Amino acid sequence: MKRIPSLIIGLLLILATWHSVLAINDNYDLIIVRNDDLIDYLISLPYSHLINAPILPVNPKELDPVTKAQLYSYIQLGRDKVLIIGNTNAVSLDVEKELRDMGFSVTRIGGADRAETAEKLALHFYQNGSKVVILASAWDYGSTLAAAEFAMEYKCPILLTWENQLSPSALRGIEKLNAKIVILVGFGINETIEKTLEGMGYETYWIGRDIEPPPIETTTSSPPQSSGSKSFFLGMIVTLIILAPVILYLWRRRSERMSEFLEQFNEKELAVLKAIMERGGEVKQEDLPRIVGYSRPTISRIVQDLEKKGIVEREKSGKTFIVRVIKKIKID
């Protein structure tokens, strides 16, 4: 646990060094998101903070009278540029038409799914690129909330990925932003994603996992700190205080989810899984009876059950099968 504060402080120093250049062709007075799913709201937070525009969650199908009254008051004050986040499944064309009929100039940024929407937002608001990007799970809202807080504080774009593999949208975003450093946040991401990024040459750090602190270049002498530097380090301390309960919550949630996940397996299934993982994650099915001591019919039934649960896959190899773990789990 002692490594976590050092890691975060190191990351903040790196973020300060790799400061991103922001370029926005259009400014917006208001950001519209759907009110029945938090994900679009969360990924819009960093950009709302960048342009000082409020976020208004609305009914995705139609504007209710109360919302219309708010919007009428807003446009009368000269705030008429609206950004809708999400495709027409997220916020309908009817809502967009209502906004235009009220006199708003409407821009929509949305993709085929939440990961692509996050990619398009990042590229729209960081048209000059960003050396650092924040990466979170598209389905772990707690991690995305923490990632959004980091992105707000240090002006970095946020991207979303799938749990077990790097989403194509996240990869495109990282490449088009010309990123050098990818910061993964939370427990909703499989370690294979980090390995994929490292294999492609990106420098990665993981907030919410106990890893070694990154190397930080130091000098023997440094100029006197300005008031801006003091404010920056004060901001780091505040960030640590804010994130501490979030990280603790994510850790507890991960432990609970892992416990619930393991409950779906019986003793024999766990024994077979452990045997496969101890041998590098794959083994010949014909060798399993000897390794775990179960009969061939029992092994065949267990492997088929694990395959149905999406934990292993089988590949034909001669007269037997190669059984391969495709979703890594920790078995004590």
Curated annotation (Swiss-Prot):
InterPro entries: ArsR-like_HTH (IPR011991), Bact_Sporulation_Assoc (IPR051922), Cell_wall-bd_2 (IPR007253), DUF7343 (IPR055767), WH-like_DNA-bd_sf (IPR036388), WH_DNA-bd_sf (IPR036390)
SUPFAM superfamilies the UniProt entry points to: Winged helix' DNA-binding domain
Presence of the UniProt keyword rRNA-binding in the record: no
CDD domains per record: HTH_ARSR
Transmembrane annotation, as ranges: 231-251
Localization of this protein: Membrane
Record Pfam families: CW_binding_2, DUF7343
Keyword Acetylation found: no
Membrane-protein topology: Single-pass membrane protein
Cleaved signal peptide residues: 1-23
Keywords: Membrane, Signal, Transmembrane, Transmembrane helix
Record-given protein name: Uncharacterized protein PH0614
